[in-house]
Amino acid sequence: MAKHKIDYTRENGLPVVLTTIDKLVNWGRSNSLWAMNYGLACCAIEMMATGASRYDFDRFGTIFRASAKQSEVMVIAGTLSKKHAELARRLYDAMPEPKWVISMGSCANTGGMFNTYAVVQGCDRIIPVDIYLPGCAPRPETLQYALMILQKKIRREKANRNQLPKRLV
């Protein structure tokens, strides 16, 4: 029990608020990201390793979800073929706003070594990408670092309920 009564209010009786609602909402958003793993090739193995006990993605507040309707972050890991492009777009459209996309690996970024008619040469041609992870295949630490960069990006954004969806120009 405290022996002294501390008055945290001003003379008006109103408490002092030292933050903005944007910072509070963005802090909550950045520390509880639910990711949908869209693993297509070798990079998916490294992405699955981030959820294991050695790297422990959960300590950053990120939980992998199987449903697009419960996810805020989409991690595209691997070669995106033209057959998968329509499905990837539908899954992206099913995600609630605000939503972010991480493109993981050279194949997801640029098509990789597969320069054929059946491979999309970069998933940013189908959906807007926020963070690109280079490498073949990127290590789990790289995905964790990308998540921390995404958290910083979310904290800087303006928390607006009437956000316009991201569009490709």
UniProtKB/Swiss-Prot annotation:
Membrane topology: Peripheral membrane protein
Ranges in coiled-coil conformation: none
Catalytic reactions of this protein: a quinone + NADH + 5 H(+)(in) = a quinol + NAD(+) + 4 H(+)(out)
Keyword Cytoplasm applies: no
Main subcellular location of this protein, as a coarse class: membrane
SUPFAM superfamilies: HydA/Nqo6-like (SSF56770)
Keyword line: 4Fe-4S, Cell inner membrane, Cell membrane, Iron, Iron-sulfur, Membrane, Metal-binding, NAD, Quinone, Translocase, Transport, Ubiquinone
EC number: 7.1.1.-
Superkingdom of origin: Bacteria
GO cellular component: plasma membrane; respiratory chain complex I
Subunit structure and binding partners: NDH-1 is composed of 14 different subunits. Subunits NuoB, C, D, E, F, and G constitute the peripheral sector of the complex.
Protein's UniProt name: NADH-quinone oxidoreductase subunit B
